[in-house]
Curated annotation (Swiss-Prot):
Listed NCBIfam families: lpxK
Membrane in keyword set: no
Name of this chain's protein: Tetraacyldisaccharide 4'-kinase
Disulfide cross-links: none
One of the record's GO cellular component terms: plasma membrane
UniProt-listed GO biological process terms: lipid A biosynthetic process; lipopolysaccharide core region biosynthetic process
Family classification: Belongs to the LpxK family.
E.C. designation(s): 2.7.1.130
Catalytic activity: a lipid A disaccharide + ATP = a lipid IVA + ADP + H(+)
UniProt GO molecular function: ATP binding; tetraacyldisaccharide 4'-kinase activity
Species of provenance: Burkholderia ambifaria (strain ATCC BAA-244 / DSM 16087 / CCUG 44356 / LMG 19182 / AMMD)
Swiss-Prot/TrEMBL keywords: ATP-binding, Kinase, Lipid A biosynthesis, Lipid biosynthesis, Lipid metabolism, Nucleotide-binding, Transferase
Domain of life where this protein originates: Bacteria
InterPro entries in UniProt: LpxK, P-loop_NTPase
């Protein structure tokens, strides 16, 4: 893993910038994007035409994913959706790939799991929702194992996996942030895994800057709101973000879109020094030992990777809550009660 702010982090930042414009590099990579698009289209067509059959795992599946590379707010969306489905009378479970974990077979994730064995996002979901969570690169196998272990589960939420066509699904939700589709090019010329025109049941847009929604059908605003920060060593100790306004604060994030976290803190009245870490940064050691600050604010996704050996009293965790549009929840519930997986 590259050091914080090192070559890998700088490369990620440059690629992200290039993907927002149609510069010389993007145009030079378009032949490769065409090849990528052709391969992706062939995979989609194989399932759409019935040449390959998706696997029905026996209960409805809601896929929460994106068509772009990088963080868009999927994890807080999954957490909020699980809570909403439970409130609507369902018993939800969650499956995920377990990115960053050495997982080859279906594995249960509990609040006591380690991020290195479960993946940071699945572990966060397990801790926040207390729902059954299973991980495996093969999401079908994960869903089948989850159902075998928890026969009361009557709906499965797939954290990402939009392009995992083998898993039959009832509802597809696509999440965007303010960058939307960037320059509109497919990988590697742009950030798109699939064309923006890809079918989905609903689109969620998290734009903390303008709040504007694109003119797409069935599009809903996704609001991500920070809560009171809690102390890493003493989770019961909480402070409103406003209390950090007059302190020397470092904000650090090893997520797909760290600038969104920093913007959230600025909107709360803070003026932190910022440090973007590589996505899924492992925190093998403490990268903050030389920082002369009063407080270090990190994301929940990063916090699950910090074990009991971390003893930096400056570390505070900023939780984020996703507010789902009631109309979106009603749409999902209606589809779950009225349709079978396909």
């Amino acid at each position: 893993m590259s050091a914080p702010g090192g070559p890998l982090a700088r490369l990620e930042a440059r690629v992200t910038r290039e993907w927002q414009r149609r510069g010389a590099l993007a145009w030079a990579l378009t032949p490769f994007a065409c090849v990528f698009g052709l391969c992706a289209a062939l995979r989609r067509t194989a399932y759409a035409q019935g040449w390959k059959q998706p696997v029905d795992v026996g209960v409805p599946v809601v896929v929460v994913g994106n068509v772009t590379v990088g963080g868009t707010g999927k994890t807080p969306t999954v957490i909020a959706l699980v809570d909403a489905l439970r409130a609507a009378g369902f018993t939800p479970g969650v499956v995920s790939r377990g990115y960053g974990a050495n997982v080859k077979t279906p594995t249960a994730v509990t609040p006591a799991s380690r991020a290195s064995a479960a993946g940071d996002e699945p572990l966060l979901i397990a801790r926040r929702t207390d729902a059954p969570v299973w991980v495996c690169p093969d999401r079908v196998a994960a869903a089948q194992a989850l159902r075998a272990a928890h026969p009361d589960v009557d709906v499965i939420v797939s954290d990402d996996g939009l392009q995992h066509y083998r898993l039959a699904r009832t509802v597809e939700l696509v999440v965007f942030d303010h960058r939307l589709g960037g320059n509109g090019f497919l990988l590697p010329a742009g950030p798109l895994r699939e064309p923006l025109s890809r079918h989905r049941d609903a689109t969620l847009v998290n734009d903390p800057y303008s709040g504007a929604l694109p003119p797409w059908p069935d599009t809903y605003a996704l609001a991500l709101t920070p809560g009171a920060a809690w102390h890493l060593d003493q989770p019961a100790l909480r402070r409103p973000l406003s209390q950090f306004a007059h302190e020397r604060v470092l904000a650090a994030a090893g997520i797909g879109a760290p600038e969104r976290f920093f913007a959230t803190l600025r909107a709360a009245g803070l003026a932190p020094t910022t440090r973007a870490l590589p996505d899924h940064y492992a925190f093998a050691d403490n990268p903050f030992v030389d920082d002369a600050v009063d407080a270090i604010l990190i994301t929940e996704k990063d916090a699950v990777k910090l074990g009991a050996s971390w003893r930096d009293a400056r570390l505070w965790v900023v939780p984020v809550e996703a507010a789902l549009d009631p109309r979106l929840i009603a749409l999902v519930v209606e589809k779950l009660r009225g349709r079978s997986p396909a």
